[in-house]
Amino acid sequence: MISQFFILSSKGDPLIYKDFRGDSGGRDVAELFYRKLTGLPGDESPVVMHHHGRHFIHIRHSGLYLVVTTSENVSPFSLLELLSRLATLLGDYCGSLGEGTISRNVALVYELLDEVLDYGYVQTTSTEMLRNFIQTEAVVSKPFSLFDLSSVGLFGAETQQSKVAPSSAASRPVLSSRSDQSQKNEVFLDVVERLSVLIASNGSLLKVDVQGEIRLKSFLPSGSEMRIGLTEEFCVGKSELRGYGPGIRVDEVSFHSSVNLDEFESHRILRLQPPQGELTVMRYQLSDDLPSPLPFRLFPSVQWDRGSGRLQVYLKLRCDLLSKSQALNVRLHLPLPRGVVSLSQELSSPEQKAELAEGALRWDLPRVQGGSQLSGLFQMDVPGPPGPPSHGLSTSASPLGLGPASLSFELPRHTCSGLQVRFLRLAFRPCGNANPHKWVRHLSHSDAYVIRI
């Protein structure tokens, strides 16, 4: 049983507020939650907080805070599951979950909350069941068009004919508009991996972890069967080995409850009949043993003149992907000593950009080709008490507050574990001659890629 549900933007602005029981302090509770959240040290806040007999449970999704409050002794895990399911429902009915889509679909969100929760008690979170009661149509930012070849979104892929699913393709609502009779039968399948790495200052690898998911978003009628074929050499655990080549191994794996595993052991095929909407077909984890080299290596060189406070940082970034692969939206973030205000730079290519932002050096590289090497020379003044006279720059100990460096990036058509989708086959038979469209994409991106200086 919950008392309130509200959605806040990343800046704390209330987008949605619903009081189910009238036993709380009104909308001020949302402001109280955000003040407590921002007042905590560090970036990671607890998902469960307590204040004057009221429990706050929240998740963060797409930059939004989804929060429930309760004064009862309710399992926090059940409320976290409810919030996760609400996030999926909002994505299904609004097309995607973000500040813009929520603002455009306030009436639809409140109608969903009225059907999902009655006086704070959960009634249903089934997309299929709710579609019989929801009357409000979603307001989308722009109509979907195959001629929209903008940047590829989360559920999009490059096909063999070099056609690209537009970014809005999978961001439309699962339920078609009543006036739209041309709803396309489409399936979007993404293999998404998050890479966490910690590299010591001498270049040795201290930690590596891959968290992977196979995500599905289906616009087919519910009950349509599909078969997903994974790499045949895929194995779970170190003791299992399949095929004659090097195995693609993960440490742990879990499946959605709707997945039929009858063909998994013999042929690495997943069978399922998904409902309309989004679900995670499979999750897996791999630690400490990647089958391929790390995508990036950083070679830093720091020279600091204590007398004048002159700091020179030379960064050489090497991309160890295959030459046909590339990394997109690469950003290096390097914390600097306190008080640095000036920056001079020499970059190896004009596409790069570097600037000071919030006490750190931010080096942006829009696109990095596999096998390439980029560099940047950065000079700055570190204010502080004068030191003994020095004859030029030296490679002495770095000033306090420098580093560690962190990288963020996206690797399209690449998985760090080596897992691939061999095929996606549908048993769906459309009424007309149009066959369902299938889009498959593989993507890796950084989660915490840290290099000590």
UniProtKB/Swiss-Prot annotation:
Domain MHD: 184-452
Subcellular location: Golgi apparatus, trans-Golgi network membrane; Early endosome
Tissue expression remark: Ubiquitous. Highly expressed in testis and lowly expressed in brain and lung.
Pfam families: Adap_comp_sub (PF00928), Clat_adaptor_s (PF01217)
InterPro entries, A to Z: Adaptor_comp_med_subunit (IPR050431), AP2_Mu_C_sf (IPR036168), AP_mu_sigma_su (IPR022775), Clathrin_mu (IPR001392), Clathrin_mu_CS (IPR018240), Longin-like_dom_sf (IPR011012), MHD (IPR028565)
UniProt subunit comment: Adaptor protein complex 4 (AP-4) is a heterotetramer composed of two large adaptins (epsilon-type subunit AP4E1 and beta-type subunit AP4B1), a medium adaptin (mu-type subunit AP4M1) and a small adaptin (sigma-type AP4S1). Interacts with tyrosine-based sorting signals on the cytoplasmic tail of cargo proteins such as APP, ATG9A, LAMP2 and NAGPA. Interacts with the C-terminal domain of GRID2. Interacts with GRIA1 and GRIA2; the interaction is indirect via CACNG3.
Family according to the record: Belongs to the adaptor complexes medium subunit family.
Name this polypeptide is given: AP-4 complex subunit mu-1
